[in-house]
Regions:
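Conserved N-terminal subdomain of the carbohydrate kinase-like
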Residues: 4-28, 44-131
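Short pre-catalytic strand/loop immediately N-terminal to key active-site residues, enriched for Gly-Thr
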Residues: 30-35, 216-230
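Active-site-adjacent loop and "lid" segments of alpha/beta metabolic enzymes
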Residues: 31, 35-38, 65-79, 134-139, ...
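Glycine- and other small-residue-rich loops at beta-strand/loop junctions that grip anionic moieties
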Residues: 32, 98-99, 196, 228
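Conserved phosphate/ATP/ADP-binding segment of small-molecule kinases
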Residues: 136-216
Length: 244
């Protein structure tokens, strides 16, 4: 039984305490991955491990096993919009992460949502899409480049994937550097680019955060002689949580 002599806690004090103790919210747009390697599964795990709370918007689902992707089933863009806006109207969002969302229509829907939250950093991940139909790839990349890159704070992707996408006519004797790729991304409005998996001598790879003007940070890793999936989604989700 409550003590009748106790005074009620001031509502404003409760709200202040909640805001100070509640984890930051990261909205992530991504596909379900039944294998558990990437997609929303990776996002939710990585965001939680970095101390933030996921607002997970399902954009579709991969049809895959642990070895390869066979297909992708995209949701209707209205279903994606309804999920996102319902959560956004209820909870404050501190960062937005965009993974593979499956169709130009969903890219457009997310771009429209993001434009209403222009002050929130948007971290975009571009995975390897070589498993997909060539025409579908072209349409998706065109929509992403035109609609989402102008709103992107940090673009994340593997060196070869970003090279093929942003510098398709590269004619240099050497492969493009992280700064070269950052310059290409900057032409569409992206201030920061995190390029992963840059080949180095002696079985090492380099991950580099760059702007067109400078390399801001780099970290060298030993290359594993193994096939794995989900690293890009995990990295991008963790970065989103740290920026939230």
């Amino acid at each position: 039984m409550a003590n009748p002599n106790s005074s009620p806690l001031d509502t404003r004090q409760m709200e202040t305490e909640d805001s100070e103790t509640s984890p930051a919210c990261v909205m992530t747009f991504n596909a379900n991955d039944p294998s558990g390697a990437g997609g929303l599964t990776a996002d939710i795990s990585a965001i939680a491990s970095a101390g933030s709370h996921s607002l997970a918007v399902v954009t579709g689902s991969y049809v895959r096993d642990t070895a390869e992707i066979f297909d992708h089933i995209a949701f209707d863009e209205d279903a994606v919009t309804e999920q996102a806006r319902t959560a956004l109207e209820d909870m404050p969002v501190s960062a937005i992460k965009v993974g593979f969302v499956g169709s130009p229509e969903i890219v457009s829907a997310i771009a429209e949502i993001a434009s209403d939250y222009a002050e929130v950093p948007l971290i975009a991940y571009m995975p390897n899409l070589s498993w997909w139909d060539e025409e579908a790839i072209d349409n998706y990349l065109d929509a992403f480049r035109e609609l989402l890159l102008p709103q992107t704070t940090v673009l994340v992707g593997n060196h070869s994937s970003l090279w093929r996408w942003l510098l398709p006519d590269w004619a240099g004797e050497k492969s493009p550097s992280a700064r070269d790729i950052a310059k290409a991304a900057s032409a569409f409005g992206v201030p920061y680019t995190l390029v992963t998996g840059i080949p180095m001598p002696d079985q090492f790879i380099d991950n580099v955060l760059a702007t067109p003007q400078a390399v801001l940070y780099s970290e060298k890793f030993e290359r594993f002689e193994a096939v794995f999936a989900g690293a890009g989604d995990t990295l991008t989700a963790a970065l989103s949580a740290l920026l939230a």
